[in-house]
UniProtKB/Swiss-Prot annotation:
Name this polypeptide is given: dCTP deaminase
UniProt record, GO biological process: dUMP biosynthetic process; dUTP biosynthetic process; nucleobase-containing small molecule interconversion
UniProt-listed Enzyme Commission number(s): 3.5.4.13
InterPro entries: dCTP_deaminase, dUTPase-like_sf, dUTPase_trimeric
Protein species of origin: Acinetobacter baumannii (strain ATCC 17978 / DSM 105126 / CIP 53.77 / LMG 1025 / NCDC KC755 / 5377)
Top-rank taxon, per record: Bacteria
Pathway: Pyrimidine metabolism; dUMP biosynthesis; dUMP from dCTP (dUTP route): step 1/2
Recorded family membership: Belongs to the dCTP deaminase family.
Binding site residues for dCTP: K112, S113, T114, Y115, A116, R117, T136, L137, E138, Q157, Y171, Q181
Reaction equations catalysed: dCTP + H2O + H(+) = dUTP + NH4(+)
General function of this protein: Catalyzes the deamination of dCTP to dUTP.
Length: 189
């Protein structure tokens, strides 16, 4: 299994729609010249952006967090350019980018150090072969202070690993429950 380069990412995105929308360079400034947390293709990965759609965890209903029976009322929906995550809490968001993962590729997501150095951890499970959709992002604020997430800017990096052989059964083949997801998707069983 080998990690894929910027050339491969560019070709797969431009010719096969692997990443849409796709930024062919690292974008570090907005149209007004203001600094951004970078996004776009890098040497061996692709930095994704966070959309304006957030679900921030709240315990106002004193619910028990149960992945088998998740209560949607545990979140407050926010649409904004900035999301404030309360201390020691978390939020869900989604990528602006829509992904179509090839059958012989596994994609791993890592948080950007800009956020990690502030105590904000990004978690995403691997994008399996032939999975497609917007990626649901999980942000954990590990600090005892409120934390800010910026929509439209880089939040995580995707690394693409191509296998030497095609998998027998892809995510699409087994009818994965998150296949084709759009928007922020809550836990399913």
């Amino acid at each position: 299994m080998a990690i894929k380069s910027d050339r491969w990412i560019r070709e797969m995105s431009e010719k096969h729609g692997m990443i849409e929308p796709y930024a062919e360079n690292q974008v570090r400034f907005d149209k007004n010249g203001e600094k951004l947390i970078s996004y776009g293709v890098s040497s061996y990965g692709y930095d994704v952006r966070c959309a304006r759609e957030f679900k921030v965890f709240t315990n106002v209903h004193s619910a028990i967090v149960d992945p088998k029976n998740f209560d949607e009322k545990s979140f407050i929906d926010i649409e904004s350019d900035v999301c404030i995550i309360p201390p020691n809490s978390f939020a869900l968001a989604r990528t602006i980018e829509y992904f179509r993962i090839p059958r012989n590729v596994l994609t791993v997501c890592l948080g950007k150090s800009t956020y990690a150095r502030c105590g904000i951890i990004v978690n995403v499970t691997p994008l399996e072969p032939e999975w497609e959709g917007h990626v649901t992002l999980e942000f954990s604020n590990t600090t005892n202070l409120p934390a800010r997430i910026y929509a439209g800017e880089g939040v995580a990096q995707m690394l693409f690993f191509e296998s030497d052989e095609i998998c027998e059964t892809s995510y699409k083949d087994r009818g994965g429950k998150y296949q084709g997801q759009t928007g922020v998707t809550l836990p399913k069983t």
